[in-house]
Structure formats: structure tokens, C-alpha cells
Amino acid sequence: MAEAKGTASIQFFRGVDEPVVPDIRLTRSRDGRTGQATFVFEQPQALAPETFGNIGGMWMVDEEGEMVTREVNGKFVNGIPSALEATYTWKTEEDFERFMRFAQRYADSNGLGYSQNQKSDQTDAATEEQA
């Protein structure tokens, strides 16, 4: 569980926080009800040679409890594990809101910020200006 109020962590082994902070990308359906968060961990501690055990999922733990995804894949370079990619899928607006509360706590716990990709909006605006 999370150690203190307001903290959040990610675990590949229950009770063991992963110290490597992932790159996280969100996608949502046009109606906003469903979507995915893709986490990419480069050189995570969970893949270190001294780590024993099978990775059975990724747990996102905070003061509200935990969310879990079993969709975790390893990336290998020349036969050596180099990254983990996990995908968390939500199917309701409530699930998305819960995920975003976790994401905010995780960002706060790790000194991270949030940025939104505006590329599609900028592309549309540029196209309209050229017309």
C-alpha cells in the first residue's frame, strides 16, 4: 500500500516500489469513455539481474487503493532485457477519473509535471489559416 497520504507508487512485485519513473502516454476514444495509458519503463529495477520472480502485472497504488493491469511486456535488445511496457485500459468515465487521480498523485510524489500534446489542434489551425 502507499506509505503516506498523498503518495502513489507503481509496483511490478507486490510491496516493492519501482524507482524508475516511466514515460506515460494517454489515448482516449472520441467520446472520451474508453482509453488507454501506456507506460514505458527504460531499464527498470524490476528487470535488474538481482531481481528474482516473474512479473505478473503492474500495480498502481495510492491512498484510494490499487489498480492493476496484467498487460505487461518486456523489450529486449540483443537478448538483454531493456524496458518494460505496460498498458492500463479503462472502459468508463469513472475509471478514467480514478486513473487521473492516481496519475496526479504519482506525478506529485515524483516531482513530475503534466503536458498535453497539442499537435493535432495546431495542425488543424495551421490548415485553416492557409486556406
UniProtKB/Swiss-Prot annotation:
It is a peripheral membrane protein. InterPro entries: Psb28_c1_sf (IPR038676), PSII_Psb28_class-1 (IPR005610). Residues 112-125 have a biased composition (Polar residues). One of its GO terms (cellular component) is plasma membrane-derived thylakoid membrane. Disulfide bonds: none annotated. Part of the photosystem II complex. This is Photosystem II reaction center Psb28 protein. It comes from Synechococcus sp. (strain CC9902). The gene is psb28.
